[in-house]
């Protein structure tokens, strides 16, 4: 169990970090292979996209697990507001643009693709910043 309010249990921390990193990596791989036409080393674009979809489902579950305690505690403590809320806004926008990619009108598809990968890269920056701040803070305390 967590030692302080808002700190995630170790299993949850690994689940959140793992699912978000896998989702980010597969998203970047798909972007490089499909949009920038880099030759895939092992996987074809459809396989990468399938893995991205599966890891996005896990990342959405991770988001749900964080909302109940971690986010609430962070808001109350007013710590890491920019990186935390930045991640939340980006994730909600990523879910919206993903829905537009699959269910939206064809004329919005290209805009949704561009928005999805730009927001995805922005999200990864917020996520890494959030993680690095926590890591530096933990090292300073020990």
Where are these regions (language model features)?
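Membrane-embedded alpha-helical bundles that constitute the cytochrome b-like, heme-associated redox core
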Residues: 1-142
């Amino acid at each position: 169990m967590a030692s302080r309010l808002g700190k995630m249990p170790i299993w949850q921390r690994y689940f959140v970090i793992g699912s978000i990193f896998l989702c980010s990596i597969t998203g970047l791989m798909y972007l490089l292979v499909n949009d920038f036409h880099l030759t895939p080393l092992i996987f074809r674009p459809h396989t990468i996209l399938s893995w991205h979809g599966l890891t996005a489902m896990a990342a959405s579950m991770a988001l749900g697990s964080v909302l109940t305690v971690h986010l609430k505690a962070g808001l109350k403590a007013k710590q890491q507001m920019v990186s935390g809320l930045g991640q939340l806004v980006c994730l909600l926008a990523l879910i919206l643009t993903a829905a537009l990619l699959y269910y939206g009108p064809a004329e919005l598809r290209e805009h949704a693709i561009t928005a999805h990968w730009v927001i995805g890269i922005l999200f990864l920056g917020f996520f890494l910043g959030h993680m690095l701040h926590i890591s530096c803070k933990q090292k300073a305390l020990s």
